[in-house]
Each structure stands twice: as C-alpha cells, then as structure tokens.
Amino acid sequence: MSSDPTHQFLIQKIVPIEIGGIDFSFTNASLFMAASAAIAAGFLYFATSNRAIVPGRSQSVAEIFYEFIAKMLTEGAGKQGMQFFPLVFSLFMFVLTANLLGMFPYFFTVTSQIIVTAALAILVIGTVVVYGFYKHGFKFLNVFVPSGVPGILLPLVVTIEIISFLSRPISLSVRLFANMLAGHITLKVFAGFVASLGALGAVGVGGAVLPLIMTVALTGLEFLVAFLQAYVFAVLTCMYLNDAIHPGGH
C-alpha cells in the first residue's frame, strides 16, 4: 500500500538474476547505489575537469568538500591519516549523495537499509584491523590497553575496550540506518495526514495546514540530517583510523 510509511523501504527486483540458485537480482537498491556513486564521481569529475585559479561554483564546492575532509582527517588521525583520504572522502561523498537522493519523491534511500550501512561499517573496521596489524603487528593490540591504567584494573578495562571495539561496526551502521529510516517514516506520516485531510474538501483543508507546515519543516530538517549523518560517519571513520595509526595512544 502506498499509504504504508514503510513501503518506501521495500527492495524490489528490477532485473531478476539467479546464478547457481543464488539471487543476484538487480534491484532498486542496486540502482540507487550505482546512481549515488556515479553522481558523486560525475560531479567531482565535472568540477575538477576545468580547474581555474579563480574557481567556479562547482569547483568551489568540490574544494570545500576536499578541505573539509582533509582537515577532519588531520585533526582526527594526524598527518599520517591523509593516506586514508581517498577512503574517507569516497565514503563521505557516497553517503551524502545517497542521503540527498533519498529526499526526492519516489527515489530509494539506500542508507535506510541496514545491510548497506553494515557493509560500509565493516569496510571501515576491516580497514582499521588490516592496516593496524600490517603496520604494527601484534603491537596493534595495544589499542585495547589504554595508557596509565593501574594493573589491578587492567583486566576489566581491556574487556571493556574489546567490547567497545567490537560494537563499533554495529553503532556505526545502526546510527546511519536508524536516523534515515526514522526521518523518512516521519515525513511520510505527516505527508499522509496532509493528503488525507485535503481529500475531505474544504473542511479538511483547514486541518491540513498544520501537518503541511510540519512536513515542510521536517523536509528542511531532513536535508540537514542528510549532511550531518554523512559528517558523523566520516568523523567516526577518522577516529577509528586513528587507532590503527596510533594504537594505544588513547
């Protein structure tokens, strides 16, 4: 049902594909993930293809994003963190573009799918673990041993640190998924109120004013949330990468 606020999150097959009994179908989620990546890459290519000393609008926006992520990385993970700039910048642009695409009517919000946000979170944590062991070997395990902890408290603190580390991909994925899901459901509910009351004619139009105002206000808020969630995802990624670069430095 179109009135169902959760209907917008249903994954639907566009091109059914099954190989060896495994479903590889191209879905609306696949389409908008590809579109998000293509739009982000296309914008950056267009913005930087004709670079000038006096930047145009698109180049200015691209430079703002570049400096924004570069500053975030150096502050969160030090100068060595810049080696991860392509990863963090790509994640930020993908999440931001996917969030913004989901704001358009009849478009699909891929970041409202826990499987998508979980895959992004696993990519981040996997990078942290692989790089940590590659760079530091078993000294990477110092990330679970904060400096200055009394020996008597060490077993308890190490246990807490391990649990905290293992919960990172969960919190990173659920935070993005839950915020996008809740925001879009709320928008759908208020928009449904407007449509239902407006269908009652002159009597319902007056009652639809308040839900309409709320819908407009929530739409503006959701655009802000779309950026903030991409920002938070990038910030946390930088913090986690710092543990791989400087284990035991917290």
Swiss-Prot record:
Xref: InterPro entries: ATP_synth_F0_asu, ATP_synth_F0_asu_AS, ATP_synth_F0_asu_bact/mt, F0_ATP_A_sf
Family to which the UniProt record says this protein belongs: Belongs to the ATPase A chain family.
CDD domains: ATP-synt_Fo_a_6
Molecular function in Gene Ontology: proton-transporting ATP synthase activity, rotational mechanism
Phylogenetic placement of the source organism: Bacteria, Pseudomonadati, Pseudomonadota, Alphaproteobacteria, Hyphomicrobiales
Name the UniProt record assigns to this protein: ATP synthase subunit a
GO terms for cellular component: plasma membrane; proton-transporting ATP synthase complex
Location within or outside the cell: Cell inner membrane
Keywords: ATP synthesis, Cell inner membrane, Cell membrane, CF(0), Hydrogen ion transport, Ion transport, Membrane, Transmembrane, Transmembrane helix, Transport
Assembly notes: F-type ATPases have 2 components, CF(1) - the catalytic core - and CF(0) - the membrane proton channel. CF(1) has five subunits: alpha(3), beta(3), gamma(1), delta(1), epsilon(1). CF(0) has three main subunits: a(1), b(2) and c(9-12). The alpha and beta chains form an alternating ring which encloses part of the gamma chain. CF(1) is attached to CF(0) by a central stalk formed by the gamma and epsilon chains, while a peripheral stalk is formed by the delta and b chains.
Residues that span the membrane, as ranges: 29-49, 84-104, 114-134, 143-163, 193-213, 216-236
Topology of this chain in the membrane: Multi-pass membrane protein
Annotated function: Key component of the proton channel; it plays a direct role in the translocation of protons across the membrane.
Species of provenance: Rhizobium johnstonii (strain DSM 114642 / LMG 32736 / 3841)
Predominant location: membrane
PROSITE patterns per record: ATPASE_A (PS00449)
